[in-house]
């Protein structure tokens, strides 16, 4: 039975794991690392790079390198968070045909789901390389505070990558699964998850294989990227103060600053001070300029203090919704690379009144939890029951633009809830059901998930028709809504498609694009491999020809030289088949050269053997003397 993989699709890094017996195992990628940068790059030659190779060339290709795209997934172009992001990233964020935020590289538009699918493909290939078999099913994690549109867009990304997404699971819940799988005693835990782009906090009760989420809260636009941005802004301001040059519009310099900021942030988790050195960051008429700034941990903490404090309110809200006090939490589990920052650990300790648990790897625990959930769904992991919740309230817009909740936040999923409504005017023959998600009292202040019309209502005075609206949330946290006229039995049902979102046709097209790209990537790899093989053969044949060319006939020598020339010409192009054919041709004609080399070696060996015999007969006495010496040694010992 094919394995189900668990993927932590992160903002900054992604990770893939699989069940190996009773334990979840994190799989190393082709570069030998256990996490993969969530970065996709398109080079000028239209080559697509994923992960570490993409990150390595970011400085020289800022506009073609896409990072932190997860922050755009499922968001509208006019979302205030997208507007903020547009000024902070070197690549282009544009308006998609459906009104969503998309990205543009080399004049081509991509949806965030497509870019995420490319990262998922890389994770899929990593798993396939380790398992030695094709992988088609996965459990993918999302921030607990993701809304329906963001969850749907993540599921679409999986589909585009050629994966059947068996379950979308919340990141803190996945972490709790990995943390608590082997713990039998009952505990109430809080999972504090501060990653590259999002923050979540979940309160769970765990024990005897039951993982019940009591509440969840968070901020889907708060993470390590914001800490990096804050540091970049500080470096830009300091450099301007010192040199009078503003680096804000220099995309190349900004990319270098971003890399340096990330490195400095990591270093300051273990040391009190670091130095940021960027030679030749820019130049003016007086010559090149260098950036050299010393940064202390205290200064960095003061720069990001408000970001750290922003994590406290969601913690308060999660405890309140769970009906608990901080002292009633038995253990606080830290998840996400940012939780390595000492200041964050201090704040967590101060809020919960206890040292946070550091026994899990914050970068890997989410993927491990996803793999465990995959094992549960496959039947390999027994006696585990996961009860998750919906993070935001769901409801519809009613008279006066009021938001009427049908399902409250932190309701255990899957769940189903119905409520009966009526018409607002006499003889109203149709009603528009507008579905929202959020916590504000007015519908317009919440996230519109979608809308649909129920038509054909018989004429009647206002308030008479009975329209039953039913909300159904599945285990992925994805919403289905239906409306039924009780009088006629007419029903209209929709799976909520975000007001933007991707249609089935869009997804189908993107799946085909992904497959075509995979084919193109495969061809490109084959071409590179063929070239490497050909160049190696040319080099070795030329070397042998220089050494043993006089051992073959003039005709054979010319045939070999012609074959080398033909292969060199072929290597200037990109036709892999032609390169392979010319390589084969050279291999065949150079066999004569191989034969000559073999004969020359044999002749040399024969001559060596003859000389050896003569030498041994003339040195018989020396051999005897050797034996004598050994005897003497024995005597003396």
From Swiss-Prot:
Keyword Transferase annotated: no
Comp. bias regions, Basic and acidic residues: 514-529
Keyword Nucleotide-binding attributed: yes
Modified residue annotations for Phosphothreonine: 198
Signal sequence segment: none
Transmembrane segments: none
NCBIfam families in UniProt: PRK00290.1, PRK05183.1, prok_dnaK
Similarity-based family: Belongs to the heat shock protein 70 family.
Protein's name according to its UniProt entry: Chaperone protein DnaK
């Amino acid at each position: 039975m094919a394995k189900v993989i668990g993927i932590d699709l992160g903002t900054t890094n992604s990770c893939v794991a699989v069940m190996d017996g009773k334990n979840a195992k994190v799989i190393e990628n082709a570069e030998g690392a256990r996490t993969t940068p969530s970065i996709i790059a398109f080079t000028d030659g239209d080559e697509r790079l994923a992960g570490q190779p993409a990150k390595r060339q970011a400085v020289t290709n800022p506009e073609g390198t896409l990072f932190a795209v997860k922050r755009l997934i499922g968001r509208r172009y006019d979302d205030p968070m997208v507007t903020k992001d547009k000024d902070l990233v070197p690549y282009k964020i544009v308006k998609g045909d459906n009104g969503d935020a998309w990205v543009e590289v080399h004049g081509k538009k991509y949806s965030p789901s497509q870019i995420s699918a490319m990262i998922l493909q890389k994770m899929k290939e990593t798993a396939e390389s380790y398992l030695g078999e094709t992988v088609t099913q996965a459990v993918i994690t999302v921030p607990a505070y993701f809304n329906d549109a963001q969850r749907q867009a993540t599921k679409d990304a999986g589909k585009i990558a050629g994966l059947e997404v068996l379950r979308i699971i919340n990141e803190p819940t996945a972490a709790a699964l990995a943390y608590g799988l082997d713990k039998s005693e009952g505990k109430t835990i809080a999972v504090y998850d501060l990653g590259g782009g999002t923050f979540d906090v979940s309160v769970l009760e765990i024990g005897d294989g039951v993982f019940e989420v009591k509440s969840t809260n968070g901020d889907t636009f708060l993470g390590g990227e914001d800490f990096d941005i804050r540091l970049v802004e500080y470096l830009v301001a300091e450099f301007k103060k010192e040199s009078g040059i503003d680096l804000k519009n220099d995309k190349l310099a900004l990319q270098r600053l971003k890399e340096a900021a990330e490195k400095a942030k990591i270093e300051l988790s273990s040391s009190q001070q670091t130095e940021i050195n960027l030679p030749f960051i820019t130049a003016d008429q007086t010559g090149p300029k260098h950036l050299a700034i010393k940064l202390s941990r205290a200064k960095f903490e003061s720069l990001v203090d408000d970001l750290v404090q922003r994590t406290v309110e969601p913690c308060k809200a999660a405890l309140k919704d769970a009906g608990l006090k901080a002292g009633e939490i038995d253990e606080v589990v830290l998840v996400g690379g940012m939780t390595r920052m000492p200041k964050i650990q201090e704040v967590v300790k101060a809020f919960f009144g206890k040292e946070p648990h550091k026994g899990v790897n914050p970068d890997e625990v989410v993927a491990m939890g996803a793999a465990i959930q995959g094992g549960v769904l496959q039947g390999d992991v027994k006696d585990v029951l996961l009860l998750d919740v919906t993070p935001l309230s769901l409801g519809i817009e009613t008279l006066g633009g009021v938001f009427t909740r049908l399902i409250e936040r932190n309701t255990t999923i899957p769940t189903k809830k119905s409520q009966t409504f009526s018409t607002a005017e006499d003889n109203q023959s149709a009603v528009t059901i507008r579905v929202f998600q959020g916590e504000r009292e007015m519908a317009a202040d919440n996230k519109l998930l979608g809308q649909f019309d129920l038509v054909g209502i018989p004429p009647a005075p206002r308030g008479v028709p009975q329209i039953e609206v039913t909300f159904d949330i599945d285990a992925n946290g994805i919403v289905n809504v239906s409306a039924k006229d009780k009088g006629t039995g007419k029903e209209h049902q929709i799976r909520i498609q975000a007001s933007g979102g991707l249609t089935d046709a869009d997804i189908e097209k993107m799946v085909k694009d992904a497959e075509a790209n995979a084919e193109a990537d495969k061809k490109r790899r084959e071409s590179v491999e063929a070239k490497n093989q050909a160049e190696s053969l040319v080099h070795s044949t030329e070397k042998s020809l220089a050494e043993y060319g006089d051992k073959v006939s003039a005709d054979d020598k010319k045939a070999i030289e012609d074959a080398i020339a033909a292969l060199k010409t072929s290597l200037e192009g990109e036709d892999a088949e032609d390169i392979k054919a010319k390589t084969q041709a050279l291999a065949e004609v150079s066999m004569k050269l191989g034969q000559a080399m073999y004969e020359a070696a044999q002749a040399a060996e024969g001559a060596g053997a003859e000389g050896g015999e003569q030498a041994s007969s003339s040195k018989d006495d020396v051999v005897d003397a050797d034996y004598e010496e050994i005897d003497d040694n024995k005597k003396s010992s």
